[in-house]
Design a protein with these regions (language model features):
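Bacterial N-terminal signal peptides that target proteins for export
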Residues: 1-11
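Bacterial N-terminal signal peptides
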Residues: 11-19
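Ser/Thr/Gly/Pro-rich low-complexity, disordered linker/stalk segments of secreted
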Residues: 25-40
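Short beta-strand and strand-turn-strand segments in soluble, beta-rich domains
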Residues: 44-46, 85-97, 119
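Short beta-strand segments of immunoglobulin-like
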Residues: 50-56, 98
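Short solvent-exposed strand-capping/beta-turn motif centered on an Asx-Ser/Thr pair
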Residues: 69-74
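Aromatic sugar-binding surface patches on proteins
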Residues: 103-112
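Short, surface-exposed loop/turn segments at beta-strand-coil junctions that are enriched for proline
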Residues: 114-120
């Protein structure tokens, strides 16, 4: 009689212990952050501005400024990247950071960029983008004329 009670009890305890990680995963997710979760979040990126005049020479530096806002109603973690694309189509990632936002919170983003002397001359662009995991939520760009 003891075996009839002990074996089913052990099976139930083992199943409960195995199911605990699955229940813990359900609490994760929400908006933002990397990994699973059904919701991707909400971000706004203001169009970036640059500190140069209309044209910049290779070898000179320029300042890049933008604002990134969490437009979701909860906390979120977004990856914010700043990149430059030359007129030849070569992309350079200038900065990439994971930033934790509260609901409605904004951050001002700035980066100094030394344009390489051998950069292709012509109209390029600077991009500021916000990602939740691998999903791009928002991006802003500004033209950068290299002469």
């Amino acid at each position: 009689m003891k075996n009839c009670l002990i074996k089913p009890t052990l099976v139930l305890v083992c199943l409960a212990l195995l199911a605990l990680p699955l229940f813990a995963q359900r609490g994760k997710g929400g908006s933002g952050g990397g990994g699973g979760g059904g919701s991707t979040g909400c971000a706004l990126v203001s169009p970036p501005t640059v500190s140069s005049s209309t044209a910049i020479a290779g070898g000179e530096s320029v300042g890049i400024f933008s604002k990134v806002t969490n437009c979701s109603s909860g906390k979120a973690r977004y990856t914010v990247t700043i990149s430059a694309v030359s007129s030849c189509g070569e992309e350079t990632i200038l900065a990439s950071s994971v930033i934790s936002f509260s609901a409605g919170q904004s951050f001002l983003i700035s980066k100094a960029y030394s344009v390489p002397a051998n950069t292709c001359k012509g109209m390029g662009a600077v991009y500021v983008s916000a990602y939740s995991g691998s999903t791009m939520l928002a991006t802003g760009s500004v033209a950068l004329n290299v002469q």
